[in-house]
Amino acid sequence: MYGADLPADQQLEFSHRYILGVYDLYDRLTKAFPDVLFESCASGGGRFDLGMMYYAPQAWCSDDTDAVERIKIQDGTSYGYTPSMWGAHVSAVPNDQVGRLTSIDMRAKVAYFGAFGYELDVTELSDEEQATIKQQVAFYKQYRKLFQFGTFYRLETPDTSDNVYGWETVSHDKQTAIGMRYQILNGANPAYIRYYFKGLDPERRYTVNDGSEVFSGAELMNAGYFVPRVMNRLQSPKVPSDFHADMFIVKAVD
């Protein structure tokens, strides 16, 4: 990149001047249209920064929309920015970037953590998938504020747990939390799985996924929640495959 109007000894100013020009344009746009939410694009182009967030408080994380890739991308983004800033969508499969096939359930459970949406041709989906999308949209609308503005926790990464990422968001009053456990690759006869929550009220009692069993917050954080898992097809034909996500909705009962 270079500036045709700049002399040779000022060419290093070009990129800086360009960004100042972008800020100036955004300033005029946001003043002219104060009720419009602008989204900047994209972190792959180095435009996911605090200066851009001043004008466009939502950014497209990456053109890489594969669910597995997006777990890593959004996990890294979480170190600097809150989920309300992440543009996160369910896209078509096979994925355009990596050709991977993931379930619409997995894709949605990754995209829930962020400014949720879809970028695919719904007319190419089966009736079952279209019905699933309606359910996903209704679910996200119910918990949108929690996903975008709750307290976000990173619970597991491949550095601490094989092939696994774990995220959680907790409401500020600690009444509700949603945890997600992403299994990238499955393995034979996995060990017993416990999901350890964070940020709950240790004195309160909670249910998980509207179950009948009641747990204290201290128990869920220190002893963990047992995740039922089919070990092999002799137990059930529904063995979790690769690219699987478990979701835990936690609600206070007192």
Predicted regions and their residues:
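Aromatic- and acidic-residue-enriched carbohydrate-binding clefts of CAZyme catalytic domains
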Residues: 1-23
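Glycan-recognition surfaces
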Residues: 16-123
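Hydrophobic, well-ordered secondary-structure elements that form the walls
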Residues: 38, 111, 179, 208, ...
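A glycine-rich phosphate-binding loop feature that marks nucleotide/adenosyl-phosphate handling sites
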Residues: 40-49, 126-130, 153-161
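Catalytic cores of secreted or luminal carbohydrate-active enzymes
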Residues: 105-156
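Carbohydrate-binding surface patches
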Residues: 158-202
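Solvent-exposed beta-hairpin/edge-strand motifs
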Residues: 198-213
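C-terminal beta-strand-rich structural cap/linker in extracellular carbohydrate-active enzymes
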Residues: 217-254
